[in-house]
Amino acid sequence: RRENPTVAGRDFELLPLREGRGRFLGSVIGVRPHGPHWWGEGEAKFHIDGDEALPTIVGTGSEDYVGLGWCVQATPYPYHGASLVEKSPLPDTAGPVSMYRWHLPDPIYWHGSMRATIQQIGVEITPQTAPRSFTQYLDCLRERQDDWSCCTFWYEPVPSAPLPPYPSLEERLRDLDLEPNLEGLPLQSGFVTQNTLE
């Protein structure tokens, strides 16, 4: 799934609503900031078994969800971390990142329904607004519109409800400055149908 840009005030969906029972395994999350300043104050939220207003599980920040703190560092641990952290040409900004969290030692099960999201909230700090207290820091929080993507893994019994339509390869790669080299790969509607990579 990819949303570029995300919609201010609407959480990015890691897992669309799934009904029935299942187990959430984790996500690989990509973020490309579209503006300056820190982007990672959004909370991961897990709405389990019908909770609406308040999710069963709520995190404290995007980097905290993947087991990091004080921004994102290239730290590939077995169950959480970041495998890619690039520098940004923008001041006071983390560049594009790829981070992940696997819920293997801390499984998340559901029995009725499940939906997982993460907020796009960041901090806008200038020399004039530099916070001197936690309350002032909270005043610097802003909804952001960046480029977020994810690949989420879960188990659920089949048959199950269909997923939202899968975007085309062109849409998934739009403005990434990548030329996909698919020559020689067996494709079916934009999917690699067997593992032929060495």
Descriptions of predicted regions:
Residues 1-184:
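Beta-strand-centric surfaces of beta-sandwich/beta-rich domains
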Residues 178-198:
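Glycan-recognition and processing domains
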